[in-house]
């Protein structure tokens, strides 16, 4: 997306394809507040101030298996560094649907760990419901878990995953992401490690 008009057009297109607000936010890597602003701005000429947000477009990584693999290796290194500090091993890599899955798949392979997939629920509101761990992949009960996502915007997804894993008897040890837009070090005492931290200066 080169500018704000591209973001508005993409948000309108995604909405017309039936995506919910939360799904549009995930697809564009922006907050729900920003999606609301983009869609509202597309419908009227009234100019309201833009929310303080940053759009992250990583499709040059996502469209290349080689680049995804290289980024996954870097995320593995970050995760292992953190696990060494606490003397823990990784048993399961948990990919957050949808954008965390390709990274988590490659990481699980590289780390010799099981793969689990977390599907969010409640895309329309932040806490509409709990997500689920897919039964078609690895079990998390009693296991050390590395959580993988693409971008942290508000931290709500990471909070949801950590809570759900703990309720299932798992031990979330670290969250690794490409980009942290929130700028947090921990969520529920679980370290957040990113390849990039984005800080907006106003």
Curated annotation (Swiss-Prot):
Pfam families: Pribosyltran. Keywords: DNA-binding, Transcription, Transcription regulation. The keyword Transcription regulation applies. GO terms for biological process: pyrimidine nucleobase biosynthetic process; regulation of gene expression; UMP biosynthetic process. GO terms for molecular function: DNA binding; orotate phosphoribosyltransferase activity. The keyword Transferase does not apply. It comes from the Archaea. Signal peptide: none annotated. Belongs to the purine/pyrimidine phosphoribosyltransferase family. GfcR subfamily. Contains an N-terminal DNA-binding winged helix-turn-helix domain and a C-terminal regulatory domain (or effector binding domain) resembling phosphoribosyltransferase (PRT) domain. HAMAP family: GfcR. PANTHER family: OROTATE PHOSPHORIBOSYLTRANSFERASE, PYRE-LIKE PROTEIN. This is Transcriptional regulator GfcR 2. The lineage of its organism: Archaea, Methanobacteriati, Methanobacteriota, Stenosarchaea group, Methanomicrobia.
């Amino acid at each position: 997306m080169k500018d704000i008009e591209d973001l508005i057009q993409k948000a309108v297109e995604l909405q017309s394809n039936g995506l919910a607000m939360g799904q549009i936010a995930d697809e564009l890597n922006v907050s729900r507040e920003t999606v609301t602003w983009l869609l509202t701005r597309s419908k009227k000429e009234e100019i309201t101030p833009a929310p303080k947000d940053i759009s992250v477009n990583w499709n040059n990584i996502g469209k290349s298996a080689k680049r995804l693999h290289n980024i996954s290796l870097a995320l593995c290194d970050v995760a292992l560094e953190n696990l060494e500090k606490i003397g823990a091993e990784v048993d399961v890599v948990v990919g957050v649907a949808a954008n965390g899955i390709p990274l988590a798949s490659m990481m699980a392979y590289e780390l010799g760990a099981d793969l689990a997939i977390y599907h969010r629920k409640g895309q329309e509101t932040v806490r509409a419901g709990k997500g689920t761990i897919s039964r078609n992949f690895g079990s998390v009960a009693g296991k050390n878990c590395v959580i993988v996502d693409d971008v942290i915007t508000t931290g709500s997804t990471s909070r949801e995953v950590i809570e759900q894993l703990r309720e299932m008897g798992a031990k979330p040890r670290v969250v690794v992401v490409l980009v942290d837009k929130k700028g947090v070090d921990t969520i529920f005492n679980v370290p957040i490690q990113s390849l990039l931290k984005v800080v907006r200066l106003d």
